[in-house]
Amino acid sequence: MSPTPAIDVRGVSKRFGTLTALDNVDLQVWRGELFGLLGPNGAGKSTLIGIISGLVRATGGSVAVLGHDTVQDFRTARRSLGVVPQELVFDPFFKVIDTLRLQAGYYGCGREAWPWIDELLERLELTDKRHATMRGLSGGMKRRVLIAQALVHRPPVVVLDEPTAGVDVELRRTLWAFARELHASGHTIVLTTHYLEEAEDLCSRVAIVDHGRIKVVSTTRELLARHPFRFLRVSLSGAPLPERFRPQAEACGDNEWELKLDRSTQPLGRVLEELRDAGCRIEDIATREPSLEDVFVELTEEAADVA
């Protein structure tokens, strides 16, 4: 990894009046990473992205993109960064091709950028929409144009803020495939998403943000490995599930349960033996390891309990 992070966040805080949106956040995203920024609604993810992109001024701390301070050297920092916003922001009267060429011009890119724009249109399946006005596009097509806008100046660092929000399954798959292509070609990618199974599949490292603070930064593999639970799904007949298991059980159907078992104190064999001793006949059984969603819920619930 390069000693200079792609994104270097140092002691960043942001307050809106009496509300603390970010509280002394430190975060480094390394060059070449596909990094996930995860958290519940209102956790501070979009505020942090706004500060990184220069759209929001931090109350305290500093941010650098590829070593360029976003305040002291903001022009170079912004040229190094492409951001796909969560909201659909566009001029309804411009054609798609004009929107992209104007966006390139903001970064000092002239006609030499047009072949790259054509390539983006092709890759994002927008070629037949190049002369359509933005207001005439579907929500999914507008989302594709926003992605193209973020890439017209070939930024080495790309931030995708909920890029698949409100899109159908087919487009979601297309966008994630494109994110993988960008990453494979050398881009550093930072994404936020509520589809945690996709973050687990795509990202090498993730940060979980809650109440304006970084709860954890780790590889997805390490996060999953240190989760203290495993899950047992059982279909029972005869006696119902014993009361002692109910606080850690979730009903999945008629006398079908998923039990959340502590790895260190509840060995699988002992649990099955206790069920049989209680008169339960086990009709079906399946186990699963924790997912990133399980870890996410565990960490954010801990924060809620502390609060």
Predicted regions and their residues:
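Catalytic Walker B motif of ABC-type/P-loop ATPase nucleotide-binding domains
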Residues: 158-162
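Conserved catalytic motifs of ABC-family nucleotide-binding domains
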Residues: 154
